[in-house]
UniProtKB/Swiss-Prot annotation:
Note: Bacitracin is thought to be involved in the inhibition of peptidoglycan synthesis by sequestering undecaprenyl diphosphate, thereby reducing the pool of lipid carrier available.
Lineage start: Bacteria, Bacillati, Bacillota, Bacilli, Lactobacillales
EC number: 3.6.1.27
Transmembrane region(s): 2-22, 44-64, 85-105, 113-133, 163-183, 188-208, 225-245, 255-275
Encoding gene (name): uppP
Membrane topology value: Multi-pass membrane protein
Protein's organism: Streptococcus equi subsp. equi (strain 4047)
Single GO BP term: regulation of cell shape
InterPro entries on file: UppP
UniProt protein name: Undecaprenyl-diphosphatase
HAMAP family xrefs: Undec_diphosphatase
Family: Belongs to the UppP family.
Domain of life: Bacteria
Alphabetized UniProt keyword annotations: Antibiotic resistance, Cell membrane, Cell shape, Cell wall biogenesis/degradation, Hydrolase, Membrane, Peptidoglycan synthesis, Transmembrane, Transmembrane helix
GO molecular function list: undecaprenyl-diphosphatase activity
Length: 279
């Protein structure tokens, strides 16, 4: 039984590692997959599991961009050190809206929107948004082509877009990429800032979910710990590849394909939801 659970954990880790960085909603995909492939765990653990396995994906960002994100990296010039600190300040400013709005409302949104139909609608709505933005951008040139040129004000408003991801199916990366592009950032800058903003956001969110799990009187069994570790390690390994793949992709392509994918998937989920309610 444990062996089968660990195989499922690997599968969930792959789903997380792929969908965390592509603007298609990792939480939405995990919930969808769990309709058909279920871990034999209680509800409290699964709610925590769906968030905490994202830590593996986040650690991949730190590994890939460690030199760029480390202000104490040997060999950096004074200007590079200053730019690194400025980047972290922009990330911190972008976190403010989530701290003020998303954290207090998280449980309420989970209770009311963490279901198939709201997820499907969010997938479609933001899919349409991506198609519209990319069509609009065909005649526009990005104003922000380097992260160092991004203003603190722009960083804050990207953080406001991130708050939208409190609705399951939205996609945190999708919301921030969409917001950054709307605010004039290039696709490369939008993707990079999304990666960096994920570090404090997801560490904080995962920490809160884990803390709530234990405060509510739950505890991890050995099998649950193994499932969580295996899924997180898998998400880490897959993310190393997907992050590099996405950064290369956005240099030559737009996000239209992801918009179309979201619309198709959302439509299929609505059909499935209706079919399930009837039968």
């Amino acid at each position: 039984m444990l062996f089968i659970e660990l195989l499922k954990a690997i599968f969930f880790g792959v789903i997380e590692g792929v969908t965390e960085w592509l603007p298609i909603s990792s939480t939405g995909h995990l919930i969808l997959v769990q309709e058909f492939i279920r871990l034999h765990q209680d509800k409290a653990f699964m709610e925590m599991f769906n968030i905490v396995i994202q830590l593996g994906a986040i650690i991949a960002v730190i590994v890939i961009y460690f030199e760029r994100l480390n202000p104490f990296q040997p060999g950096k010039s004074p200007q590079q050190i200053r730019l690194t600190w400025q980047l972290w300040l922009k990330v911190a400013i972008a976190c403010i809206p989530s701290i003020i709005i998303a954290v207090p409302l998280d449980d309420w949104f989970d209770a009311h929107f963490n279901h198939m139909l709201p997820i499907a609608i969010a997938l479609i709505v933001y899919g349409i948004a991506f198609l519209w933005i990319e069509k609009r951008n065909q005649t526009l040139e990005p104003r922000v082509v380097k992260l160092s040129r991004m203003s603190y004000k722009t960083a804050f408003f990207i953080g406001c877009f991130q708050v939208l991801s409190i609705i399951p199916g939205t996609s945190r990366s999708g919301a921030t990429i969409l917001g950054a592009i709307i605010l004039g950032a290039s696709r490369t800058v939008a993707a990079d800032f999304t990666f960096f903003l994920a570090i404090p956001t997801m560490f904080g969110y995962s920490g809160l979910k884990a803390l709530k799990f234990f405060i509510d009187g739950n505890h991890l069994t050995l099998s649950q710990l193994l499932v969580l570790l295996v899924a997180s390690l898998t998400a880490f390994a897959v993310s190393l590849y997907v992050i590099k793949l996405l950064t290369d992709y956005v240099k030559k392509h737009d996000f239209t394909v992801f918009g179309r994918y979201r619309i198709v998937l959302g439509s299929l989920l609505i059909v499935y939801s209706v079919f399930k309610s009837l039968f």
